Amino acid sequence: LVFSSGGLYGATHLPLALLDKAAGGVKVRHLPTNGGGPAITAILGNNAQCTTQSVSATLPHIKAGKLRPLAVFSATRSKELPDVPTLKELGYDTEYYLWVGIFAPKATPEPVVLTLRDAIKKAAHSDQFRTSLANAGQELAYLDGPDFQKFWDVDGKRTDDAVISIGRVQG
């Protein structure tokens, strides 16, 4: 079984390491490519049999009947793919998220941080932004500073474990 990813230690390689750990050793050959698009092309060209990608990157191919979604790494099912189970539903204790955060320099004055947080929250919850996300097959998972820090701490540990399990990096 050949697994394609967007590259070594990348956002689409790490989930395989997490699944490997949760499944107790998945026997696959890794085919790193130069990005998500080439990883999907590897599947479409029958050079690989599986990949991990975002819903938005694969949705057009799923709708065209060229790819079959098997599971999602999130804790809940995707709104775009409600019939596709989570890995946890299938008995694998693992989660993985592709996310985007907004950061400021550590020395940024608190009033500026609060102004930025308020503006970002307002923009993130706007109808225009939500519509744009939905059109791209994405879902809003907004977390403000303290909640994002909690997520960051858990996700950072999960990511560290995945990188170490792949090898060549010491814990």
Segments from the language model and where they lie:
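Conserved, function-defining micro-sites of small-solute handling proteins
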Residues: 1-171
